[in-house]
């Protein structure tokens, strides 16, 4: 257990950051699933709208350092390809 005041503060900060990161990561996964679901349903208009929202979430999470920028680019590229392949 943390003994010094600094160590106790670091424990508190880590817990706060962990909760925040968990929520943002969850939002990211939900956004990606939404695009995948729209693509599977075959509705291109809905897929494009959901894709734009997902890109916003992906960029937001990447800018906060939750995921690496290359991983964000990979997600966006694959989702974009799936939406464009709909026809």
From Swiss-Prot:
Q: Which GO terms describe its cellular component?
A: cytosol; small ribosomal subunit
Against Pfam families, the record matches this protein to: Ribosomal_S20p
Sorted alphabetically, the keyword list is: Ribonucleoprotein, Ribosomal protein, RNA-binding, rRNA-binding
Cite the GO molecular-function annotations of the record.
Answer: small ribosomal subunit rRNA binding; structural constituent of ribosome
* Keyword Manganese part of the UniProt annotation: no
Q: Which GO terms describe its biological process?
A: translation
Q: Report the InterPro entries cross-referenced here.
A: Ribosomal_bS20, Ribosomal_bS20_sf
Give the family from UniProt: Belongs to the bacterial ribosomal protein bS20 family.
- Tell me, in a sentence or two, what this protein's role is: Binds directly to 16S ribosomal RNA.
The record, for NCBIfam families, names: S20 (TIGR00029)
Please identify the protein, giving its name as recorded. Answer: Small ribosomal subunit protein bS20
Q: Which gene encodes it?
A: rpsT
